[in-house]
């Protein structure tokens, strides 16, 4: 029975390894040498709530784009810090920049979706680029994105930024974003299969053809969804439009979180809502993560220390650990994260399991998902501001 269990777990890890290998070999990147054959007006749209720490560098890099035809619109989403003041400084410096004050958040809307909805109504461009207020852009971020949008024939192009990490916990936990994305979602099937479940997007960089954005209903169609980027990507495929996912490390980077507390809260905000508030789904994910990413490493320690394992069982455990580490090493090399962080995979996944439980606890305990001073209940209705 033990050998059968170990074989099933090894098979699951092998499938993840195959998916990761295919993705590493096939995922395209945004490249500086890519130039659009046409340069329609691009509206760069930035929702900003309490972003005084980062918005200045974001705007400074957007001001230096080599794409000549664009505007930048910032929406201050009722910030209570210096976000509006910092962003306002750019209005006098650059006529391409505009800032608007966000309306109060209405019932039934998640804050970011409402901010993006307001931005879309302010935009003048044929192309809409939604970016986060903590992204840093190379000079060719717009031109490479538009070129790839045109080349691919996509209606929505989303780029996965390079994650800038500094602290121990950032190095340990944030590479899991690549692991979850590239070891679970077969990217070729995103292009080839219409099934909307085979879709994802990264809200840090979403480049739309305006007509497609309006046709799927824009952010209003996902107004009560916490993980709006993924659900918009699903809508794109559901409505018969084309989705392209690219690695954007050379074009855009982001330092999402600066501490374990920020990572804990940021991921807790998304996981349970992203699973549709389904207790069976989160329980299954916890068990799967423990069985494939945590338990094998404890078993390997026991094999080494006690020797009380059959040869076959010991070999299966060693294969599980070796293959999982190989997956993480390959992803670290391809996506330019610290190699040593791969060795901390069981620690990272143990913490992630804790975050899954916390995300569920937030909602079931009656409080709700929390982000940027707002709390949402299980229907993503605003509870407190």
Positions of the model-derived regions?
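Short, well-formed alpha-helical segments that are part of the catalytic scaffolds
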Residues: 26-32, 51-64
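Cell-envelope/extracellular polymer assembly enzymes that use nucleotide-activated donors
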Residues: 40-43, 71
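N-terminal membrane-anchoring/stem segments of glycan-assembly enzymes
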Residues: 1-38, 175, 187, 352
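Acidic donor-binding segment of Leloir-type glycosyltransferases
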Residues: 59-106
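Membrane-embedded multi-pass helical conduit in multi-pass membrane proteins
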Residues: 36, 281-366
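Long helical/loop segments within the catalytic core of UDP-sugar-dependent glycosyltransferases
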Residues: 9, 23-26, 98-121, 140, ...
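Catalytic donor/gating beta->alpha subdomain of glycosyltransferases that bind UDP-sugars
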Residues: 149-183, 211-214, 219-282, 369, ...
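Acidic donor-binding/catalytic loop of UDP-sugar-dependent glycosyltransferases
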Residues: 82, 131-148
